[in-house]
Curated annotation (Swiss-Prot):
Keywords: Ribonucleoprotein, Ribosomal protein, RNA-binding, rRNA-binding. This is Large ribosomal subunit protein bL21. This protein binds to 23S rRNA in the presence of protein L20. It comes from Aliivibrio fischeri (strain ATCC 700601 / ES114) (Vibrio fischeri). One of its GO terms (cellular component) is ribosome. Part of the 50S ribosomal subunit. Contacts protein L20. Belongs to the bacterial ribosomal protein bL21 family. GO terms for biological process: translation. Signal peptide: none annotated. SUPFAM superfamilies: L21p-like. One of its GO terms (molecular function) is structural constituent of ribosome.
Length: 103
């Protein structure tokens, strides 16, 4: 059984027991989170596609940890001008473990 749900402006295909990183959620570590923006649920041969959402569809997850991703360097360089600007960015994330999918 797997589901496709939307969180943080992105769509994720998940199954039970899977761990994934989402955009930062404002919840405590160890808390349970429910996602009701479910776009599709597949249970064996039976596939339910929402228009746009599946009625009564829910994905339940447990928050494992919060953290920051790897550093991304941004470099702005102007040739022949002796001008260079360098900046770094680390995006916050929330790691969750999928505990249940219901239709």
């Amino acid at each position: 059984m797997y589901a496709v749900f939307q969180s943080g402006g992105k769509q994720h295909r998940v199954s039970e027991g899977q761990t994934l990183r989402l955009e930062k959620l404002d919840v405590e570590t160890g808390a349970t989170v429910e996602f009701d923006n479910v776009l599709m649920i597949a249970n064996g041969e039976e596939i339910t596609v929402g228009a746009p959402l599946v009625a009564g569809g829910k994905v339940t997850a447990e928050v494992v940890q919060h953290g920051r991703g790897d550093k991304v360097k941004i470099v702005k360089f102007r040739r022949r001008k002796h001008s260079r600007k360098q900046q770094g960015h680390r995006q916050w994330f929330t790691e969750v473990k999928i505990t249940g999918i219901s239709a």
